[in-house]
Amino acid sequence: INTAYTDNGTQSNLINDLFADLQTFLSKYLGWMIIILANGFLVFSIYLIFTKYKNIKLGGPSAIPKYSYTNWIAMLFSAGLGIGLLFYGVAEPIMHLSSYPGMVDGDISYNAGKAIGLANLHWGLHGWAIYSALGLCFAFATYNKNLPFRVSSLLGSKVANNKPLAVTIDIIAIVTTVFGVTTSLGLGTEQISAGLSHIISIQETFSNKMLIILVITLIGLLSVSLGLDSGIKKLSQINMVLAIVLLAFVFLFGPTVFIVNALVQNFGAYVNTLIESATWTEVYDSSSWQNSWTLFYYSWWFAWAPFVSLFIARISYGRSIKEFVIGVLFVPSLIVFLWMGIFGNAAIHQVINE
C-alpha cells in the first residue's frame, strides 16, 4: 500500500515495520482461524445448493431478476476481480515456481501444476465463497426480512434496530473496506505506472502515481454517480468484453496446444491437492511463505467482503438461493481458472523455453 505513495522506493520504515509486525502476529497466532473460516465459508456455500431452502427466491416467490444472466455475471466479475488479476495472472505462477517451499528440484511438471494450483487457490473458490455466503445473508436480510441494506443487518433485527450498535458495526465495516480498497488501489497504481514506464517511457515518479490514483478515482466516481444501470453495468460490460478479447488473443496467438494440455493437467492437479493446499498452515516449516501469500489473500478477501457482498446482494434480487450460490461461487471461479490457466501457462511456457 505504502509503495504507491512514495517516490523512488523511499518508504516510511515506521509504517512498513508496523504493518509487517501486524501481519506476522496475525499469521502466527490467528492464521489457523483465518484458514478455517475461509474453508468454512466454502463448505457452507456448497451446502446451501443442496438444502431444502435452495429454491427460496431473494425477494419472495414473485420476485423477478432485474438483470439478465450476462449482465449479472459481468457485474459479478467486475466487482470481485480487478486490476490485480491482470498482473498476477502472469506473475503469480512464476513467483510460486521460485518461492514456494514445497517445489521439487528438477520436476517442472509437478512444480508448474502446483504453481497454477496455488494461484487458483488464492483467486478462486475460497474467496468467492466468502462473497457468496455474506452476499446471500445480506440479500436475504434485506429482500426477505425487510432489514436495512447495511452490514449490521447481518446480526438480526435487534442489532439493526439498535442505532448506536448498528452504526458502530457499520463504521467498522467501512474501515475494513477502506483497507481492502487501498490495497487494490496501491497495487493497481504500481502496475499501471510500471506498464506506462515500460511502454511509453513515462517515469515512475510520485506525481505520476498520484495522477494515476486521481484518474482511477474519477472513473470510479463517475461510474457510481451515473447509477447502477447507466454507470456500473455499462462499465462492467466493457470490462468483461475487453477481458474476453485479451484472453482470446493470448490463447489464440500464444502456445495454444501447450495451454490446452496444461489446462487439463492443471484441473487434475488442483482437484487432487485442493484440500491439502487449503488447510496448510506451514506449522512444520520455518519459511514465511504462507504469511506472505495465502493468509494475505484470505485477509484481503475478508477485507473486501462487506463492500463487495453488499454490491452482489444489490444486483441479485429475484435469484434463488441455489442460483445465487452457483452464479457467485462457481462462475467467477471458472473464469479465474481459465485466466490463470491461459496467462499463467503462457508465462510458464516462456520460462521453460528460455
Where are these regions (language model features)?
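N-terminal alpha-helical transmembrane segments of multi-pass membrane transport
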Residues: 1-111, 225, 248, 252
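Helix-loop-helix module between adjacent transmembrane segments
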Residues: 1-2, 8, 42-47, 82-85, ...
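Extracellular/periplasmic helix-exit of transmembrane alpha-helices
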Residues: 6, 88-102, 250-273, 333, ...
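Membrane-water interface regions at transmembrane-helix termini and the short interhelical loops
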Residues: 18-27, 45-66, 114-122, 137-147, ...
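Alpha-helical transmembrane segments and their helix-start/interface "positive-inside/aromatic belt" motifs
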Residues: 30-36, 64-85, 124, 164-174, ...
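Hydrophobic alpha-helical transmembrane segments
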Residues: 31-39, 112-135, 209-215, 281-305
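Juxtamembrane inter-helical linkers in multi-pass membrane proteins
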Residues: 61-64, 101-110, 148-166, 264-285, ...
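Selective recognition of specific alpha-helical transmembrane segments in multi-pass small-molecule
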Residues: 75-84, 130-132, 173-182, 211-225, ...
